[in-house]
C-alpha cells in the first residue's frame, strides 16, 4: 500500500510536465507520434486524478486542505513547494484534466504538419500549470504558475491559431500584454505583503505558505488588506474576465483553435474566480467586505454588457466568448455578494460553465471548419445538413443559459437566490441577464440552423464518430450536473461555510433544488 504522505499532487504535476518535455525536446518522437503520446499521457493523468479523488481525498472534510505536501525551497524569502487541495481545488483539477484528452481528440486531424507534436506538448504544459495553480498551498507557487502559463498560451494562440497570421499575432500580443500587466500588479502586491508582514512572523521560511498568511492577513490593518486585495483583484479581474478589462477575450477566441479556447475559457479563466475565493475572500476578508458593492456592481455590468455584446456578434466564436463574459459576471456576483448560497452557486457555476462552454466552442469550431468561415451570416438551415451538430449546439446553449435539468440551472438559481436575500435590485438586474442570455442562444440558433440550407452549404458533413465521441462525456456531464447536483453542492458548501458567510432562509429551498 502506498504511504498516506505520498506526493500525489506533485506526481499530477510531473506527469504532463514530463510528457511536454518529451514531446518538446525529442524531435523523432515529435515527428512520429506526438498526438498519440500526448493523449496517453493525458489519460494516465486523468486516471490518477480520479484515483486521488476516489481513494485519497476525504470528502467528509472537503473544506480542509488535503493531499498535503510541503518542502522548503527558498527559505530566506519564505518560499516553499507546498501543495494541497480543498474540494474546490480538486474539482477544478478534475475539470482540467478531464477536458485535456477531449481537446486532444477533438483536434486530432487539425493541421500541424510543420511541427507535429508541438501543439500537444503545449497543451500538456498547460495541464501541468493548471494542476499547480489549483493545488498551490504557497502564494509564490501560485504566482509562478500564474505567470508561466502565459508562454504556452501565447504560442497556442499566436502560432497555432486559425485564420490570418497577423490577426493571430495581434490577438496573442493583446492577451499577453493584458495578462502581464495584471501579473505585474499582483507581483507588486506580493512584494508589499513581504515588506509589510515578514517582520510579523518569527520564522520567515514559511511566510508565503497559506496557513501562515491565513494567520496574519485577516487580522492585519484594513489599509494593508486593501493594498493586497486591489493588486490581486486587478490580475484576477483580467483573468476572469470582467468588464472593462475583458476585451482581450473575444479577439483571442476569434483566432484560437477551438481546443485552445476550451482550455482558456473553460478552465484557465476560472483561475480568476478561484483566486478571488481562495486568496481575496480568505486572506483579506475586511477588504473584500469593504469592496463588496463595487465588485457586485461590476459583476452585474459584466452580466449585462457581455450578454448585449454577444447579441451583436456575427462571428460565432466571438459570440461564444462574449457569453462567457456574462457568465463570469454571475460567478463574481456570487463570490462577493456575501451569501453562502450564492458562493456555493458561484463555485458550482465554475464547473458547469466549463462543461457547457467546452461543448459550444468545439461545436462552433467544427461548424466553422466545415463551412470555411466563422461568419454566422454565411449559414442557414444547418439542422437539415448537420442535424447532430445542430442538436448538440442547442443542448449546449440551453445548458449555458440555465435551462432546468441541465448543468447551468442549479448554480444560476443559487447565485440569484443568494443575491436576492442581500440585494433585491441587484438580483433583478442580474435576472435581465437571464433574459438576454435566451436571446443570444436562441436567435443565433434560428439564424444558423433553421430554415432551408443555404447555397454552397448543402453538402457539409455532420459530426463524425470521433467528434460524437468527444461530445458524449460533455453532454453526460451537463445532464448529471443538472439532474443529480446534490453531491457537488454538498462538497462545495463546507468551503463556503469555512469563510464564515451568512446563511439565508432560502438555504433549504436551494439545497432542495439541487437534489
Region locations from a protein language model:
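Transmembrane helix-loop-helix hairpins at membrane boundaries of multipass inner-membrane proteins
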Residues: 1-8, 22-121, 203-215, 498
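Central hydrophobic cores of alpha-helical transmembrane segments in multi-pass inner-membrane proteins
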Residues: 10-25, 39-52, 93-108, 126-127, ...
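Helix-coil boundary and interhelical linker segments in multi-pass alpha-helical membrane proteins
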Residues: 1-3, 84, 131-139, 223, ...
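Juxtamembrane/interfacial segments at transmembrane-helix boundaries in multi-pass membrane proteins
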Residues: 57-80, 168-172, 184-246, 276-294, ...
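Alpha-helical transmembrane segments of multipass membrane proteins
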Residues: 20-25, 101-104, 130-132, 155, ...
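Structural signature of hydrophobic alpha-helical transmembrane segments
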Residues: 4-15, 85-96, 140-152, 225-236, ...
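Predominantly late transmembrane helices and immediately cytosolic-facing juxtamembrane segments
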Residues: 243, 356-363, 427-460
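Alpha-helical multi-pass transmembrane bundles of energy-transducing inner-membrane proteins
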Residues: 29-31, 118, 122-125, 129-220, ...
Amino acid at each position: 500500500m502506498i504511504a498516506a504522505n505520498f506526493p500525489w499532487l506533485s506526481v499530477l504535476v510531473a506527469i504532463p510536465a514530463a510528457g511536454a518535455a518529451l514531446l518538446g525536446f525529442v524531435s523523432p518522437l515529435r515527428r512520429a507520434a506526438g498526438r498519440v503520446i500526448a493523449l496517453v499521457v493525458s489519460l494516465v493523468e486523468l486516471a490518477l486524478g480520479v484515483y486521488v479523488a476516489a481513494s485519497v481525498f476525504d470528502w467528509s472534510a472537503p473544506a480542509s486542505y488535503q493531499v498535503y505536501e510541503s518542502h522548503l525551497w527558498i527559505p530566506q524569502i519564505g518560499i516553499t513547494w507546498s501543495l494541497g487541495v480543498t474540494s474546490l481545488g480538486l474539482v477544478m483539477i478534475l475539470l482540467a484534466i478531464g477536458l485535456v484528452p477531449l481537446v486532444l481528440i477533438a483536434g486530432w486531424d487539425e493541421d500541424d504538419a510543420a511541427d507535429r507534436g508541438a501543439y500537444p506538448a503545449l497543451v500538456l504544459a498547460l495541464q501541468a500549470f493548471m494542476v499547480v495553480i489549483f493545488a498551490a498551498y504557497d502564494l509564490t507557487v501560485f504566482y509562478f504558475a500564474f505567470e508561466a502559463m502565459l508562454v504556452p498560451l501565447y504560442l497556442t494562440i499566436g502560432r497555432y491559431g486559425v485564420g490570418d497570421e497577423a490577426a493571430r499575432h495581434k490577438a496573442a500580443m493583446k492577451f499577453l500584454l493584458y495578462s502581464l500587466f495584471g501579473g505585474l500588479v499582483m507581483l507588486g502586491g506580493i512584494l508589499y505583503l513581504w515588506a509589510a508582514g515578514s517582520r510579523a512572523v518569527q520564522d520567515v521560511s514559511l511566510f508565503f505558505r497559506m496557513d501562515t498568511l491565513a494567520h496574519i492577513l485577516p487580522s492585519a490593518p484594513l489599509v494593508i488588506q486593501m493594498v493586497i486585495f486591489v493588486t490581486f483583484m486587478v490580475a484576477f479581474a483580467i483573468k476572469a474576465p470582467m468588464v472593462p478589462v475583458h476585451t482581450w477575450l473575444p479577439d483571442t477566441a476569434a483566432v484560437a483553435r477551438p481546443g485552445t479556447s476550451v482550455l482558456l475559457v473553460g478552465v484557465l479563466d476560472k483561475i480568476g474566480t478561484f483566486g478571488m475565493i481562495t486568496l481575496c475572500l480568505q486572506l483579506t476578508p475586511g477588504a473584500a467586505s469593504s469592496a463588496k458593492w463595487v465588485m457586485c456592481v461590476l459583476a452585474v455590468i459584466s452580466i449585462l454588457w457581455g450578454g448585449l455584446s454577444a447579441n451583436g456578434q456575427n462571428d460565432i466564436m466571438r459570440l461564444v466568448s462574449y457569453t462567457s463574459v456574462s457568465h463570469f459576471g454571475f460567478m463574481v456576483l456570487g463570490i462577493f455578494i456575501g451569501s453562502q448560497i450564492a458562493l456555493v452557486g458561484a463555485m458550482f457555476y465554475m464547473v458547469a460553465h466549463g462543461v457547457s462552454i467546452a461543448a459550444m466552442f468545439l461545436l462552433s469550431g467544427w461548424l466553422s471548419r466545415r463551412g470555411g468561415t466563422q461568419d454566422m451570416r454565411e449559414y442557414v438551415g444547418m439542422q437539415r445538413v448537420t442535424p447532430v451538430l445542430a442538436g448538440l449546439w442547442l443542448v449546449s446553449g440551453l445548458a449555458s443559459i440555465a435551462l432546468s435539468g441541465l448543468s447551468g440551472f442549479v448554480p444560476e438559481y443559487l447565485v440569484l437566490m443568494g443575491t436576492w436575500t442581500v440585494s433585491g435590485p441587484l438580483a433583478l438586474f442580474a435576472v435581465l441577464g437571464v433574459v438576454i442570455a435566451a436571446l443570444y442562444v436562441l436567435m443565433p440558433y434560428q439564424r444558423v440552423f433553421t430554415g432551408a440550407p443555404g447555397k454552397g452549404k448543402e453538402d457539409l458533413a455532420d459530426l463524425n464518430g470521433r467528434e460524437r465521441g468527444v461530445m458524449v462525456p460533455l453532454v453526460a456531464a451537463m445532464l448529471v450536473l443538472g439532474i443529480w447536483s446534490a453531491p457537488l453542492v454538498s462538497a462545495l458548501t463546507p468551503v463556503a461555510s469555512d469563510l464564515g458567510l451568512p446563511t439565508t432562509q432560502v438555504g433549504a429551498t436551494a439545497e432542495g433544488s439541487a437534489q
